[in-house]
């Protein structure tokens, strides 16, 4: 007699469950519920402008030049001469300066308003020690270098801008256009910014100063850029700038940028303001609109939000120019999966046969696995035991960290490479059209969104890899002490309570500690027999004799039935 009993447990691999799912977007699965997320975006609020952390931020061109506009400094007004400190970033705080603080300027006839902004766009700016032209001996001379009471110097005497020489001819006669070469005199390979201009007044003053009352012609040329002007005669009301005297005349001021080694030219008639000291500038930097004073420090300066501290790699809200360690603008909020695909708590189904299917982790997640995302569970007389596999969980976390790093690399390298190309274009044309800038932002936003979608896809799809690895690990540890029954589950030949499961999760499980017969899954026990003096050989003889007799009897009976059915044998029964 044989008795079969089952003391087996089932051990399964699986994923934790959660009651508070989040939603992330993926490339092919759309929106997916997950157990955790890492927000990648923030929406900033407006703040005051600040200094960029770790760098010098330029507000005013010359912080020590009191009562001076940046245009005064750029033109070299006598009372506004000072060093311009180097800076990695600059704030455009004067959008449209109205006066020069010196001789009245016709701002709207040239791009002179842009000169301070141009200078702000360089990290290092210095005024040359020597003059680029000799005004007194220039063609059409000799000249007297004029000064004006409307442009007082530091001793309140008559003065004029340091960047230009007012060339008043000693011989008051008209002249045909003359040309002067403007050499490159910067010594460190910088861009040379040369300021020049011309003066005009009413007819009486024009004849008095220059001997010619007709409109005068002027042309500048540098780096393939040529600009033409014709002076306006008369019609100006008297105007005083700051402490200066009222003036009926006006000056038109322009500038040209000369690259290293390049010579510029100026063609002129009477009333020319010949270039003198030039700006030598190097290290192109971005300039954004903002306001002063600069308060505190910030990671990023943003035209719309002011000073920002970077807490997330991306931001939503208003897109605008920014400088520093800034988050990148994206159209919509982005989240990276930081966990597993959401599964409701699993419910075990009843067995279907001896090796019936179990609704394990593949049909839901297991509660209680608070120390990790992946792990094991056992089911038996002890109930349900759950243990997290920390190594597998750490591998999943490492994958997410790798995705975050990849997104950061995308931000720092690829996207900045695209922005850098646009910045080069910006350097060439000085002002990038807002529509082009918006297109760049849209393109970068789309690239980032796709990268996040693909990252989420990879994180979620990697769950199958982790589960398969866990299953292989579990199979190897259990060895011959268990039978694989599918769906990541194994039927053990021993009991496996919480202690057993914890050892499996820790990788210290030893099947020998739970081996037969102590926890034998199928206990095969011989039937008890009374000892009546028979030895084993006698017992076996009885068994074999009885079995042989039974076999012979059955064969004879079958033969008789066959013969009767063929009418070869008749059978009579007598009572």
From Swiss-Prot:
Topological domains annotated Cytoplasmic: 565-575
Extracellular compartment residues: 1-543
Residue ranges crossing the lipid bilayer per the database entry: 544-564
Keyword tRNA processing appears in the UniProt entry: no
Assigned GO CC terms: host cell plasma membrane; membrane; viral envelope; virion membrane
InterPro entries assigned to the protein according to its UniProt record, in alphabetical order: Capsid_hemagglutn, Hemagglutn_HA1_a/b_dom_sf, Hemagglutn_influenz_A/B, Hemagglutn_influenz_B
Molecular function via GO: host cell surface receptor binding
Positions of the record's site feature: Cleavage: 352-353
Covalently lipidated residues, kind S-palmitoyl cysteine: 571, 574
Major site of localization recorded for this protein: virion
Keywords carried by this UniProt record: Disulfide bond, Fusion of virus membrane with host endosomal membrane, Fusion of virus membrane with host membrane, Glycoprotein, Hemagglutinin, Host cell membrane, Host membrane, Host-virus interaction, Lipoprotein, Membrane, Palmitate, Transmembrane, Transmembrane helix, Viral attachment to host cell, Viral envelope protein, Viral penetration into host cytoplasm, Virion, Virus endocytosis by host, Virus entry into host cell
Entry PTM: Palmitoylated.
Biological process according to GO: endocytosis involved in viral entry into host cell; fusion of virus membrane with host endosome membrane; fusion of virus membrane with host plasma membrane; virion attachment to host cell
Cysteine-cysteine disulfides: 12-489, 68-80, 102-151, 496-500
Membrane topology annotation: Single-pass type I membrane protein
Keyword Transmembrane helix: yes
Protein family per UniProt: Belongs to the influenza viruses hemagglutinin family.
Protein task: Binds to sialic acid-containing receptors on the cell surface, bringing about the attachment of the virus particle to the cell. Plays a major role in the determination of host range restriction and virulence. Class I viral fusion protein. Responsible for penetration of the virus into the cell cytoplasm by mediating the fusion of the membrane of the endocytosed virus particle with the endosomal membrane. Low pH in endosomes induce an irreversible conformational change in HA2, releasing the fusion hydrophobic peptide. Several trimers are required to form a competent fusion pore.
Quaternary structure note: Homotrimer of disulfide-linked HA1-HA2.
Descriptive protein name: Hemagglutinin
Gene name as annotated: HA
